[in-house]
Amino acid sequence: MIGLLIITHETIGEAYRGLADHFFPNGFPENLHILGVQPDEDQNDIINNAIAALQEFPDNRGVLIMTDIFGATPCNAARRLVRENKSAILIGLNAPMMIKAIQYSSQAENLSDFTETVKEAAIRGIFAITSAPEDLVCKEHG
């Protein structure tokens, strides 16, 4: 099992908890912890809180840390927690990333492979639609 730690600005992570509840109605996964960073929070306090969260995970195959914005405080704190084969980071948290991570973390055995799989899900979940589909027809209600 791979542990999952989400470190985001304020309540963004909690919004993702709600999304997880929607997709996984049998309960919030035990291997997922969320840490919300406050605007005035000290960097060392953030790191200490993250270390405490990491220590709550059972002896497992590593922890994937997901953060929201590259270069921002949550990301900078998380970068200090990376340890080869023990923890990795994905930055740019989105819904497909989180759903894939939750869906497969319990059976994942290799942190590096798992991280790449989750990253690919995040990338494949992004689309740009710049024009209306040609077959879109609105029906009149009558």
Where are these regions (language model features)?
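N-terminal loops that bind phosphate or other acidic moieties
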Residues: 2-64, 70-142
